Amino acid sequence: MSGKPLLVTCGLPYTNGPCHIGHLRTYVPADFYVRYMRRSGEEVVFVCGSDNHGTPIVISAEQEGSTPRVLSERYHEHFYETFRRMDVVFDRFGMTDDAMNHETTRSIVERLIENGYVYAETVSQSYCPDCERFLPDRYVEGICPHCGAVARGDECDQGCGQHLEPGEIKDAICKVCGGKAEYREQEHYFFRLSAFREFLLDYLPALGGTSTARNYALGWVKELLHDWCITRTLDWGVKFPGRDDLVVYVWVDAPIGYISFTKEWAQKAGADWKDYWCGDETGVTHFIGGDIIYHHCIFWPALLKGAGYGLPSAVVASGMVTIEGKKFSKSRGYVVWTNDDYLDQGLPADYLRYYLLSYTNHTKELDFSWKVYGERVNNEIVGTLGNFIYRTMYFAEKEFSGVPDLAPRLEVIEEIERSLAAVDGLMRDYDFKNAVDAMMTLASFGNGYIQNNAPWKLIKEDRAAAEQVIADCLQIVKALVLVFEPLMPDAMQRAWTMLGYGDDIADHAIAEATAPVGARPLAKPSTLFAKVEKDQVAALEATLNERVERANAAAAPKMPVVSIEEFGNLDIRIAKVVSAEPIKGSKKLYKLVVDLGSEKRQVVSGIAQFYAPDELVGKDVALIANLAPAKIFGVESRGMILAAGDEASLLVPLRPVKPGTKIR
């Protein structure tokens, strides 16, 4: 045990849209960690809340004719209920727009002002003359001055990830009306982040959590630290002290929410919030997505230091999520919604929790695939863990009517102890994937133990020996149920009850895994886990594919209307592929020779990733024959092969057609 109270927080979900599985990469591991630490004897408080301020919420509320508060409350309830369904249970889930956070934020900002870490400065800020308003943050879009990518006003989210100050973005466009923005001067307030460079260089190397968080932050600090503008020209948000026309920047009041939510919890629990946020030895651990490392490892500890608060002891940053091998994108349809696509389809929260924690290392990119999901559920959860628990309890109930009154063999206890020690070390290192693997290794040991000892055969010759085997296996079952509970709480509570215990498994420590199960009657067991059927996986894949197709159709640029005469200018003919070979230095291009009946031509086509050369030879394809010749990768191309979609599906005739036939 650590000997000090632990406080675990999660990055705040933004109340601007529904929960998807990308969100869960932060919240499920945090809940897993909290449950495990509590079952290991640690005192842990788990707080979070919704992030309610900032320009995106104001814009969304304006677009739907609502108010930011109404929009925030709606999605706050949505996230609260979704987390409950996913068995992510916080001690406090607050709102950054609640009175406590307004009060705490203003208090901390006032202290920063008193300590000399905030100053006023007149800056150029984007202004839309058509809308007659200043354009903070996401009200404006333009070009990142650092890398040239398309960026929003406060962050280069599509490119280098750098924080952008007001006035830095180039070629600014108003997101409200689409008009060109101009720059006008306005007074704002800045936090002296640059004053904390030496502090951060000393603090970050000792910061616990994942190495990605430390290393990324150190890289940024070693380069250059700019002071942060901490005010915005908005009506919605926490008012900056002494200025009714300015609010505090959302990345100030959002992390301060961690403190506010701790205060709210402490008021109800009769505890002292200062035990967690004041003093040199705090036990604060932040679970965040990898895209907000800068805010949590640089800006946040500097702000806390400047205001005289304690500092986080660990930051655990996750990798990003991809969908079926594609970059996560709501606009392109590559998204899996937690409720609509998963929970509302009757799929267990336990299965998704397992997938998110066992798929890969927490800091690496996680790809969500429905096919892989089905395979892992069926092979690992059902086939390994569920199979061992069920066959053990079924045999115990059938042959002995309950748990034999026998102590487990020493070798079984030692194997359980080895497994639990491995799990404990990995959990405290935030190595969740390998911790889950170590748990599943114990289940595999159990399967091997019962299979090798074959009590169904042994009972015919030596009933006492068979009874000992089952007592050993039931001890392994107990250990598995206790250690898997933080990962799959619903299923393990049911398994605990089947073992004959009538209380809440959460009231028991993992250390009880080696205490004898004890003689007790067992009811006929039921299966803990159901397989995911192939037709269900196919239906879920179809839903995702349809969403992607709809998104692609909606995003497709609308082409201008052309006359029949203009279309007639295109000479589109059927051509037969005579040969196909890769172009040196390119992974995408083929050099094709095609037969047009009256002549043969050389054409370059970008279909190498989708077809082997021998698949193309002899195939009839559609060719634009009067396209101006061009050199592509140094190879002359006289025409264009027509193909459809991202997978480059070739357009071919349904019946045999002579090469050179014109398409009309």
Swiss-Prot record:
Keywords: Aminoacyl-tRNA synthetase, ATP-binding, Cytoplasm, Ligase, Metal-binding, Nucleotide-binding, Protein biosynthesis, RNA-binding, tRNA-binding, Zinc
Catalytic activity of the protein: tRNA(Met) + L-methionine + ATP = L-methionyl-tRNA(Met) + AMP + diphosphate
Example of a GO cellular component annotation carried by this entry: cytosol
Cofactor or coenzyme needed: Zn(2+)
GO molecular function per UniProt: ATP binding; metal ion binding; methionine-tRNA ligase activity; tRNA binding
Domain tRNA-binding: start-end pairs: 566-664
Biological processes per GO annotation: methionyl-tRNA aminoacylation
Residues reported to bind Zn(2+): C144, C147, C156, C160
Entry keyword annotation includes ATP-binding: yes
Similarity comment: Belongs to the class-I aminoacyl-tRNA synthetase family. MetG type 1 subfamily.
Assembly information from the UniProt record: Homodimer.
Known function: Is required not only for elongation of protein synthesis but also for the initiation of all mRNA translation through initiator tRNA(fMet) aminoacylation.
Record-given protein name: Methionine--tRNA ligase
